[in-house]
């Protein structure tokens, strides 16, 4: 073995392991430390040349108009849509959730008023002593609601109405710096990409962080071991949510000390965090019912308290800061998201309305699809009700509606394009019932499950 090691040499420069400080082995090849240093120098020179060419290229300057901010971004107070206008637009896309829409409308209006105020202060006469006298703090938003209740849709509709860059990030992929996973700065990279790498435009955008409840601390008490995908991510997000100058790697991935980063001021970015927070109702109910436990509790008071906490939807209306802390969010993180909106669980009636009323309702989408084949599609009112009932049973909110209609329309969309004589088609309640009743298999009346005991 020693004889074999003596013949090891670098596959690039040919020097033996005795002539270099370090020889790194790969699958059938070797490279020395001198060749690695040379490769690093070549890459650094190439990176600098590319950046110089990018800065001098007229095409890039035309593509990234950083000197001309997007006109649709409201910088004047008169151009900012009022809360009633924002809610009216949300009503066209989102059914129900009146309280959440009102909270979002006011929060977004105040956020862009703050942007207009800062823009006005920056353009004041420098001789004015009152310039920058009052600093308006940012108010990020937390959306709490069950899956399929419209959290992401609300944020997307807001961005569409305001015509600003909007990015969606998944909190489950984030980890603390130094561990396998995505850095929190990659969230800002998505916003930059949406704004065509225009930093000025990205700094006025909206970021929606989904599944924020998945980064909750695993236990209420701080753990000895590091929680790199839970509390560690919350700690990493603190400065970004509050407002800081963040360094974003333009190519994504981890930050590298030898690579230049794009600096973004996050103080102007509106962060909307959303999550289902499964089990939060139990925490609220437990807190509300604490005082009714014991021998000295009045029996009449017990009855009233029990009625108050029976329905989980009513429990979340009494949400407090301590409940989120017990769930696993650290107080510093909650303090940087002062606006909280609780979304209601969708009822059968709401699901029916979602199918037909919004601008992009599913019924309208499938009517448009079949109209391309010169077929007029219609739904009987009873069939819409049957679809909503089936979606309600699945307990996945509005997301269940699309999967049900896709199942229902599969055979229809498969055969209708080939039927030249068919010009109209109607979905009936019987078709919906037959589709899902056939999936229920009943056991024979006399059958019993036999469990064999092991010897």
Swiss-Prot record:
Binding sites annotated in the UniProt record for Zn(2+): 10, 13, 32, 35
Question: Which cysteines form disulfides?
Answer: none
List positions binding ATP.
146-153
Task: Extract the SMART domains matched here.
Answer: AAA, ClpB_D2-small, zf-C4_ClpX
Q: Does the keyword Metal-binding apply?
A: yes
Any Gene Ontology biological process:
cell division
**Positions of the region Disordered?**
52-75
- Output the HAMAP family linked to this UniProt entry: ClpX
| General function of this protein | ATP-dependent specificity component of the Clp protease. It directs the protease to specific substrates. Can perform chaperone functions in the absence of ClpP.
- Subunit note: Component of the ClpX-ClpP complex. Forms a hexameric ring that, in the presence of ATP, binds to fourteen ClpP subunits assembled into a disk-like structure with a central cavity, resembling the structure of eukaryotic proteasomes.
Query: Family per UniProt?
Result: Belongs to the ClpX chaperone family.
Quote the protein name from its UniProt record: ATP-dependent Clp protease ATP-binding subunit ClpX
Species, as recorded:
Prochlorococcus marinus (strain MIT 9301)
